[in-house]
Amino acid sequence: MTVATATRPLTALGAVLDAFERCASVRAVADRLPARGEVLRLGGLPGSSGAVLAGWLAGRLGAGRLVVVVATTPSDAERWLGDLQQLVGDGVALYPQREGLAEEEPHYEIAGERIETLEALLRGDLRVLVTTARASAERTAVPEALEALRFRIAVGEAYRITRVLGTL
């Protein structure tokens, strides 16, 4: 039976992370974990074992630390996201690339997902961020600009229809 801890939530595959931690080679990686601001690059893991490692790291590093997975393609990023959501549960998000669309013609679903991911990142809600190299290189609005783009509607408040339509 898998038990939720402060660093590892109860998920369907949480037992996989528990078993993973008992491997000798994983303990060797644990001894090499980088200090804040340093980087550790690992590769060569087949199938979903990379996601198991990333999920284990997210639990091991705990709150305030972020594991970033940079996938080669958008479909690889989606695969990583699905695997990590099953292993880690909440605290995993995808920062998608714009799929080759010009800045002037944004795809609104992708733009919305990017904003939601940035907001979760800034709130400290993420333990694992999945993205692509291309997405990480694309220009993105700074947090103040993201807040300026937000339009909140509350029950009982009056809004000019032109403002609502202009925002939409």
Regions found by a protein language model. Name each.
Residues 1-168:
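ASCE RecA-like P-loop NTPase motor cores
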